[in-house]
Amino acid sequence: MKFFLDTANLAQIREANALGVLDGVTTNPSLMAKEGIKGAEGCKQHYLEICEIVNGDVSAEVLATDFEGMVKEGKELASLHPNIVVKIPCIAEGIKAIRYLYGKGIRTNCTLVFSPGQALLAAKAGATYVSPFVGRLDDISSDGIDLVRKIVEMYSIYGFDTQVLA
């Protein structure tokens, strides 16, 4: 099991990193906005600051929702730092982008996963990580942990290397 922090707050990241147990950080546009980070250049600079703190993977999410846009942003983000993992939504265009980026050696984190079927698509496309929305499922009276259990079991049975972040 790995410990990832879901935040863009540098103080929280420093504090968790000081414990010596932090394996990585995941971010998203909402978390960046909450920290007052604006624009693509502001986000890129912030990702670099996070990478300087953490000796582990840092998920940086694309803003585009079309294949071409996700691929373009994904390449740009991946070129910032070796620890950047491109976070892409689990939509049809996102699965195509994950597959394309995988072919280019770019690591990805497939987010907005609500079902084992979506997790299967992400793994088949070559995602490094998959991020099921456990909290959201729990909020709507679904069992988020059960989803994680099903995904982990499926990946184990079929030999997928994709890791589950929950």
Q: Which residue stretches match the model-derived regions?
A:
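Short active-site oxyanion
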Residues: 1-3, 21, 83-85, 106-108, ...
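Active-site beta->alpha loop and helix N-cap motifs at the rims of alpha/beta catalytic domains
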Residues: 4-5, 9-13, 19-22, 27-100, ...
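Short, acidic/turn-prone active-site loops that include or flank metal/cofactor-
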Residues: 29-31, 113-116, 134-139
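Alpha-helix N-cap and loop-to-helix initiation/capping positions
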Residues: 38-45, 69, 114, 139-147
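Anion (oxyanion) recognition and catalysis
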Residues: 51-52, 102, 123, 156
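Hydrophobic, well-structured mid-protein blocks that either form specific transmembrane helices
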Residues: 82, 86-130
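Catalytic alpha/beta core domains of metabolic enzymes, predominantly
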Residues: 107-109, 120-166
